[in-house]
Amino acid sequence: MPELTEVGARRGHTVNDEAFLHPSFGSGPDLASHGTGFYTKDDFIDILKYAKDRHIAVIPEIETPGHARAAVAAMTARYNRLMKEGRKGDAEKYLLYHPQDTSKYRSVQRWYRNVIDVALPSTYTFLEKVTDEIRDMYKEADATLATIHFGGDEVPRGVWAGSPAVHALMKENGRVKTMDDLWYYFYGNINSMLKKKGLYLYGWEEIGMRNTRLDGRPHILPNPDFAGENIQVDVWNNVIGWGAEDLPYRLANAGYKVILSPVSNMYFDLAYQKAFDEPGYYWGGYLDIDKPFYFIPFDYYKNSTEDINGNTVTSQYFKGKERLTDYGKENIPGIQGLLWSETLKSPQQMEYMLLPKLLALAERAWVQNPAWATEKDSVKAALLYTKNWSQFLNVVGKREMPRLDYYAGGFHYRVPSVGASTINGNVVANIQFPGLAIRYTTDGKEPTVNSNLYTTPIPRKGPVHFKAFNSNGRGGKSVIINSIKAQ
């Protein structure tokens, strides 16, 4: 299947996807740009060996049936090539999209023809071929493969409606009566294929959900067909304000293995704060180190204080939401921090978005429940949390950040901006992490590591520029405050 790399892995300006794909993130017309590329077999085996030596498990993801634009285009190009050669049987062997499909849809990213046709037998031939190739690479690397993630997210409405293969399947298979049934048909087939190979199915929350209606309105519930099948799901949608805040707990209570992956607390590609010069997305809110730190895996309602728009929420907001049962707790193997890299163009950008938030994730994943997480008295819980939070910030700022400055060549973690205000005509400043140095200037110039060190309030009329610096002299973003001297 050479088209997977010759077509699917190349990006450039084109009016169709026959030779390569149009770029999603502005990598430009040049095929030699950063938008083009792939890992070779040897590359992937090296990654597996490197990870194994460091006790890291690499879980591959084959995005299906959505987010498959490259695979669909590649196998369509293969089909066209072999049909021109008169090899109809070979051409159809790995086809992922019916040539006469008239379905009309757009993905969230505004793409068309990016969804695999789940009614084509060739779809399963292709996916089994890819699965077997992946297994072989794990064997060659002497690495363990227990599961493969088969996606399941962001499949738009309207897919398959115009597929001749789908309409034929509905006539032949009495269990496939609606478009929703195609979903269960597809993942049922994938689950069976993986079980025969000694693997279990892993995917996004959508693979464990069933669409139905309640009082005439659309309603989603955990799919009982797959519960108890040892299927594992990443559940991202606990967005406070969207209505599905209890979805992770509902799936765990129903028997699914749930990896808590909440966008509200663990999506590290979200911007640290609402500021024009802060990189990152904001569709799921803003995410600084406090949100993964105060996340309580088995009772995250308790410490949720704001909705997606930053509005205050109280415990009353979660009244009526399903809580996690003791049985459900047994179905949560862990929590996960997620960093989507499509807009990150350098290792430094990746490290900036990842650190220091990753330290808070480790605190919640590897440390037993803190006292404030289980304290029933809300006043006592708040006091315990404040004390623990202060201790954590001191440890990060005074011990962990200096380590990160030099460990493995140093990491480009985010140095936070200085907080500044005026009180009685004096300029006062503070910093999120004790241990970082606050430098300032009053001449309008950008602070450097040699500028004045802030230690006490500054009696000042006019602008003051502040910047924080770490132990090796790397600074964060500067801030300016204009003060008016008290009369």
Which stretches of residues belong to each language-model region?
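Short, compositionally stereotyped local motifs that mark structural "simplifiers"
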Residues: V379-Q487
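Flexible, acidic glycine-rich loops studded with aromatic residues
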Residues: Y200-G425
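Active-site neighborhood of glycoside hydrolase catalytic domains
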Residues: S107-Q232, N237-G243, P248-R250, A254-G255
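Soluble non-cytosolic domains of exported or imported proteins
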Residues: F38, D42, D117-P121, T125, ...
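Aromatic- and acidic-residue-enriched carbohydrate-binding clefts of CAZyme catalytic domains
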Residues: M1-D53, A70-A119, G158-T178
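Aromatic/hydrophobic pocket-lining residues that form π-stacking "cages" and hydrophobic walls in ligand
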Residues: I47, V58, I190
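Structured core elements
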Residues: A57-E61, V115-D117, H149-G151, Y202-G203, ...
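An acidic- and aromatic-residue-enriched active-site/binding cleft used to recognize and process polar
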Residues: M1, A9, I56, E61-R69, ...
